[in-house]
Curated annotation (Swiss-Prot):
Disruption outcome: Formation of large groups.
Ch-type lysozyme domain mapped to chain residues: 24-235
Gene from which the chain derives: cf45-1
Name assigned to this protein: Counting factor 45-1
GO cellular component, as recorded: extracellular region
Native organism: Dictyostelium discoideum
GO molecular function: lysozyme activity
Protein's GO biological process: aggregation involved in sorocarp development; cell motility; cell wall macromolecule catabolic process; cell-cell adhesion; defense response to bacterium; glucose homeostasis; killing of cells of another organism; peptidoglycan catabolic process
UniProt-annotated stretches for the region Disordered: 231-297
Residue positions the entry lists as glycosylated: 166
Length: 297
């Protein structure tokens, strides 16, 4: 009996180590649909979750407080939030006001969280010129820092340059998207942008399904994480990039476009609260792209 118990404990520890650096993320639509039993199931294979708290013109995610409580009750140790803001979206400018509103609402709702990630990616009708976009993102990051929030940036090598040009030196953590289904930081050419030389987290697969919940898969830290089944069409030899978390314009169209600096561009798709986002891509192979989506207007 003692041997059996010891063997069981070893197996449980092994499972915990395999998933020690696994994380999932999902958009505001999914936030409002995850049940307590879903959370219990998700907690068995993930130590971290990132949920969308703000979605452009659609604003604050109303169910975020109960979702965070559900994740905490299930035993997920690290809970992050992400916000998609855009300077052409209603109620988002100046970004300092939007960030102040988000942080204030979270405090009023009694929400405790580890980090707030600023989602930087393209969507139709969401952005102005590169200079204005860069100033908008920098203001958002600096405002969060001034409020004492642990803040980082989510983007990809392609989305970053398309959205904010050569903006660099923000000095915050990077969560990058590269859909190569490889939970590691071995793909340095895909996170060396914006002045970053090392990342905190990688979104390595999208459009996956865990416990009946639509999620994107992420890796963080320096431990191990078994690759989950996500999807992302396109990209050859793992050399494309994209970003996800999704956004849509005020007219209800959305985009989570994948782009590359290498031999191909990845594609992914994501649903938004008013439409579906998709990233375009070329070439074939097992791939890397990105795309979950959530709406912004």
């Amino acid at each position: 009996m003692n041997k059996l118990i010891s063997l069981l404990l070893v197996c449980l520890v092994a499972i915990a180590l395999v998933n020690a650096d696994c994380a999932i993320d999902f958009d505001s639509d999914t936030v409002n649909s995850v049940t307590s039993s879903d959370w219990s199931c998700l907690a068995a294979s993930n130590d971290r979750v990132i949920m969308q708290v703000f979605s452009g013109g659609y604003g604050y995610t109303s169910g975020i407080a109960s979702a965070v409580q559900g994740a905490q009750a299930a035993g997920i140790s690290t809970i992050d939030l992400y916000a998609f803001l855009c300077n052409q979206c209603s109620g988002n400018s100046p970004s300092s006001s939007a960030i102040q509103s988000i942080v204030s609402q979270l405090q009023n709702d009694g929400v405790s969280y580890n980090m707030l990630w600023i989602d930087v990616e393209q969507c139709d009708g969401c952005w102005g010129d590169l200079g204005d976009n860069a100033a908008f993102v920098q203001e958002a990051v600096e405002t969060a820092q001034n409020l004492g929030v642990n803040v980082g940036v989510y983007s990809s090598i392609g989305e970053w340059s398309q959205t904010v040009g050569n903006l660099s030196g923000l000095g915050v953590d990077l969560w990058y998207a590269h859909y190569d289904n490889n939970p590691s930081f071995s793909d340095s050419s895909f996170y060396e942008f914006g002045g970053w030389t090392s990342p905190t987290m990688k979104q390595y697969a999208g459009n996956g399904n865990e416990c009946g919940v639509s999620v994107d898969m992420n890796f963080f830290g320096s431990g191990t994480c078994s690759a989950s089944t996500g999807s992302g069409s396109g990209s050859s030899s793992g050399s494309s990039s994209g970003s996800s978390s999704g956004s849509s314009s005020g007219s209800g169209s959305s985009s989570g476009s994948g782009s590359s600096s290498g031999s191909s561009s990845g594609s992914g798709s994501g649903s938004s609260s008013s439409g579906s986002g998709s990233g375009s891509g070329s070439s074939s192979g097992s791939g890397s792209s990105s795309g979950s989506g959530s709406g912004s207007s």
